[in-house]
């Protein structure tokens, strides 16, 4: 059975990581962020669940 040649694996993995790093840096650098972001206040409406408005009876299981 022939041996698997692993001499190039380190170079392949390192070049892949370097390429991914460069690609992500280019992708992130294209985003434009506003220098002064302002929070938008949104009103949250509390939704009423049916069991909050009516009384429900919970039974214990028979032992």
Swiss-Prot record:
Residues in coiled coil: none
Residue(s) carrying N6-acetyllysine: 57
Gene Ontology terms describing biological process: proton motive force-driven ATP synthesis
GO MF annotations in UniProt: proton transmembrane transporter activity
Record-linked Pfam families: ATP-synt_8
Originating gene: MT-ATP8
One GO cellular component, as annotated: mitochondrial membrane
Assembly and binders: Component of the ATP synthase complex composed at least of ATP5F1A/subunit alpha, ATP5F1B/subunit beta, ATP5MC1/subunit c (homooctomer), MT-ATP6/subunit a, MT-ATP8/subunit 8, ATP5ME/subunit e, ATP5MF/subunit f, ATP5MG/subunit g, ATP5MK/subunit k, ATP5MJ/subunit j, ATP5F1C/subunit gamma, ATP5F1D/subunit delta, ATP5F1E/subunit epsilon, ATP5PF/subunit F6, ATP5PB/subunit b, ATP5PD/subunit d, ATP5PO/subunit OSCP.
Free-text function comment from the UniProt entry: Subunit 8, of the mitochondrial membrane ATP synthase complex (F(1)F(0) ATP synthase or Complex V) that produces ATP from ADP in the presence of a proton gradient across the membrane which is generated by electron transport complexes of the respiratory chain. ATP synthase complex consist of a soluble F(1) head domain - the catalytic core - and a membrane F(1) domain - the membrane proton channel. These two domains are linked by a central stalk rotating inside the F(1) region and a stationary peripheral stalk.
Main location (coarse class): mitochondrion
Keyword terms: Acetylation, ATP synthesis, CF(0), Hydrogen ion transport, Ion transport, Membrane, Mitochondrion, Transmembrane, Transmembrane helix, Transport
Membrane-spanning parts: 8-24
Entry similarity comment: Belongs to the ATPase protein 8 family.
Organism: Balaenoptera physalus (Fin whale)
Protein name per its UniProtKB record: ATP synthase F(0) complex subunit 8
Membrane protein topology class: Single-pass membrane protein
InterPro entries: ATP8_mammal, ATP8_metazoa
Compartments in which it is found: Mitochondrion membrane
């Amino acid at each position: 059975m022939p041996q698997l040649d692993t001499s190039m694996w380190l170079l392949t993995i390192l070049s892949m990581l370097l390429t991914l790093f460069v690609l992500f840096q280019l992708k992130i650098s294209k985003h434009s962020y506003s220098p002064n972001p302002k929070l938008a206040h949104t009103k949250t409406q509390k939704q009423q669940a049916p069991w909050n408005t009516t009384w429900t009876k919970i039974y214990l299981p028979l032992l």
